[in-house]
């Protein structure tokens, strides 16, 4: 009665809100449950998938499932849902060829600086994509038609977590994942770039090639790949040749082509316990940067911080970076290395690192180089990191949040800014999010300052880089 009476309301906005509320109330009080389940999590256009429609009525209320509509395909049902009797219907379904890949709508187009380009403004503001497959269940409840929508999902049973739901995604028949998002050509015009090719469907073949700027040469011209089973992987290499090119920055794209279409997307999963699985289909591209670099040091010992990508970057420019643990740090081991680096927030991972001071000071006295990176002020004070350092300093909560805030060099002749490579203001171009935070605001006279920066109207932060020479 009440649901039908809502049709008399002329205000469409409030009518829709109240209809939704009553539908949720009907669903809750009858214990009505329904879902649409795919046998796979991801399928390419043209793939055949199996879909199970399931429903149960946990009440004596007279409920009849009349039909289910999926992407304009009507599936007649006409089944009376008797109290606590489970209903299931399985169908085979071909994924339409015209469906777009399920990439996040704000990431389909490559963003520019601080701006995302969205093709369909109707998506704007939505926290995620709407499901590519929506099933509509048409019920007759006590003589009244009530319709509910259900997104297509893949469900597995996890022994510890129970039912594990993943939103069904439309993918490609093939994915290309570059090994690195950025490749650095250091003192060289040629380099092999590695990609991983993954089959998105059974019995699929294509040619993998490169879209490169004019003048950038590569070999081979293409790789022919064939897969028997979905999920198979192959690793391929292309040699990129920048000989004779004056530019130092390039973007290259990888493409897979079959008889009908071409594809230039990879696949990536963001998987954490506290959020639903996020499936991404990023563009298959690599940024190339070419430059010359003088390296006095070759071997670096590194103590990792959480989510630390610095070792990867150092490896790309030719350093040998060994990830060590607290237990491996001793003078004999450190003598093998040109430098020891504490990772970003390394003390968050292992508080006992502060106990390494005797070994590290001996290493420094013998001529070793030690770099301690970013730490928060609370961690600094709670762990009394001042007792770990050779000289005192205090960490503040000061920050430089303006990405383009000018950087000023305070000591242009300092060796750290000139050897083995000269550091100039251009090296601070392209820093994003912010210039820095948790700057030291007090330090011993034994430290030298190299750079300073500040937001408009704020005091300069001279403690971005502090250096002290000890021993050899």
Locate the predicted segments by residue.
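Long beta-sheet-rich domains in secretory-pathway and surface-associated proteins
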Residues: 39-289
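Alpha-helical scaffolding within the catalytic cores
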Residues: 283-286, 326-330, 355-358, 458-465
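Catalytic beta-strand/loop cores that center a nucleophilic Ser/Cys/Thr
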Residues: 396-472
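A glycine-rich, often tryptophan-bearing local segment used as a flexible ligand/cofactor-contacting loop or short
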Residues: 345-428
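Proline/serine/threonine-rich low-complexity linkers at boundaries of modular beta-sandwich domains
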Residues: 21-33, 164-174
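Short beta-strand/turn micro-motifs composed of small residues
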Residues: 199, 304, 374, 453
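Aromatic-Pro/Gly-enriched surface loop or interdomain linker
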Residues: 262-343, 396
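The feature marks non-catalytic terminal segments
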Residues: 1-28
């Amino acid at each position: 009665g009440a649901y039908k009476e809502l049709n008399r309301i002329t205000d469409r906005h409030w009518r829709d809100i109240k209809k939704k509320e009553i539908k949720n109330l009907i669903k809750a009080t009858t214990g009505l449950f329904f879902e649409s389940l795919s046998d796979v999590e991801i399928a390419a256009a043209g793939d055949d998938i199996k879909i199970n429609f399931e429903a149960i009525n946990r009440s004596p209320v007279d409920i009849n499932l009349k039909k289910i509509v999926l992407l304009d395909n009507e599936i007649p049902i006409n089944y009376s849902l008797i109290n606590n009797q489970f209903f299931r219907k399985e169908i085979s379904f071909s994924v339409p060829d015209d469906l777009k890949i399920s990439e996040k709508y704000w990431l389909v187009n490559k963003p520019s600086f601080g701006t995302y380009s969205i093709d369909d403004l109707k998506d704007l503001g939505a926290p995620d994509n709407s499901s590519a497959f929506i099933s509509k269940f048409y019920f007759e409840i006590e003589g009244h038609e009530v319709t509910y929508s259900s997104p297509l999902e893949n469900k597995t049973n996890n022994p510890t977590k129970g039912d594990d739901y993943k939103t069904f995604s439309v993918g490609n028949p093939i994915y290309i994942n570059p090994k690195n998002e950025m490749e650095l050509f250091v003192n060289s015009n040629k380099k092999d770039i590695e990609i991983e090719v993954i089959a998105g469907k059974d019995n699929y073949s294509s040619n993998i090639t490169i879209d490169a700027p004019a003048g950038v040469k590569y070999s081979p011209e293409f790789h022919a790949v064939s897969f028997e089973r979905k999920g198979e992987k192959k690793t391929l290499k292309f040699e990129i040749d920048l000989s004779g090119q004056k530019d130092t920055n390039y973007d290259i794209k990888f493409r897979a082509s079959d008889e009908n279409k071409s594809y230039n997307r990879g696949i990536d999963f963001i998987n954490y316990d506290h959020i639903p699985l996020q499936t991404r289909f990023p563009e298959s591209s690599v940024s190339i940067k070419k430059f010359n670099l003088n390296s006095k040091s070759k071997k670096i010992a590194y103590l990792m911080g959480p989510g630390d990508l610095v070792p990867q970057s150092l490896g790309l420019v030719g350093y040998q970076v060994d990830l060590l643990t607290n237990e491996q740090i001793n003078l004999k081991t450190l003598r093998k290395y040109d430098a020891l680096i504490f990772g970003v927030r390394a003390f968050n991972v292992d508080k006992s690192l502060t106990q390494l001071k005797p070994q590290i000071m001996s290493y420094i006295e013998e001529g070793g180089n030690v770099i301690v990176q970013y730490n928060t002020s609370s961690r600094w004070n709670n762990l009394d990191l001042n007792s770990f350092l050779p000289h005192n300093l205090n960490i503040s909560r000061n920050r430089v949040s303006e990405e383009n805030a000018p950087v000023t060099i305070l000591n242009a002749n300092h060796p750290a800014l000139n050897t083995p490579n000269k550091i100039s203001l251009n090296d601070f171009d392209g820093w994003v999010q912010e210039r820095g935070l948790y700057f030291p605001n007090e330090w011993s006279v034994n430290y030298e300052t190299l750079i300073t920066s500040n937001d408009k109207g704020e005091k300069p932060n001279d403690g971005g880089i502090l250096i002290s020479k000890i021993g050899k």
